[in-house]
Amino acid sequence: ILTCEPDIVISLYGDADKANALQEQLGVPVVTLMSGPDSVFDERFNESVRLLGTIFEESEKAETLIGFIAAERAGIEARTADIAEEDKPAVYICGLGNWGTTNHLMTAQDYVSFRVANVKNVVSDLGAPGAQPIEAEKFVALGEDMDAMIFDAAAVKNIKPLYAEDPTMFDTCRAWREGEAYLQLAYNAYYTNYEIALINTWFAAKTAYPDRFEDVDMTEVTDRVTTAFLGKPLAEEIYACPNSFGGYQKIDTATFFAGTQG
């Protein structure tokens, strides 16, 4: 860090003592940011954006971004707010990143994209919040309840060798047997890509409610959100990355993990 001669250091590591120690060592301000459990939809994320706006004298831009996120959320919720509980499909979020890449057993019962999109999470009885692995037996037991599965792209490289050993590993999942398996972009490993978390919420909604989101094009959503966050449309560039596997899609269950893709 010293070789970069920074004027300020922005940290996402929420340890005040370590931040203070680094600040003393470097002799420049060290600012720590937090987002909270609801990721891009959390008020603490908004507070962090506002803080950055103040630091860099871009408060107007910060408020514009916060307003954009709120409008995107409202746009999703407006399409799903009237859906009765019994009409919500049960979806399994598969392979969430958690301090690195994981496999199909890493999930979350409080996955915020499902809550915002008004999607029923097939996992509901874990003992703690946040991303965590479930037992293989539990995954099997949940299989018949899965109307759809959404795989996080970060987990694909770890699932492929498991699938090579046992190509029947998903056969207990009704969603897999019926071809209702989908791929979202990786958004979290050690830290979070907040723009992707927002785009993934649109994809969760479109996956669960295709009729209500028929007019939503994921490339257009990706370009719109990356422009708001990063200043330019990036769908083509992101989808072209090897570990994006072509971007948002319904996957071919016969070939995707068998080595003919990715």
Q: Across the structure, where does each feature detected by a protein language model lie?
A:
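Extracytoplasmic substrate-binding proteins
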Residues: 18-99, 123-124, 131, 187-243, ...
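Active-site/pore-lining binding-face segments in mid-to-C-terminal subdomains
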Residues: 147-212
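Short, glycine/charged-enriched secondary-structure capping and boundary segments
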Residues: 23-25, 105-108, 164-165, 197-198
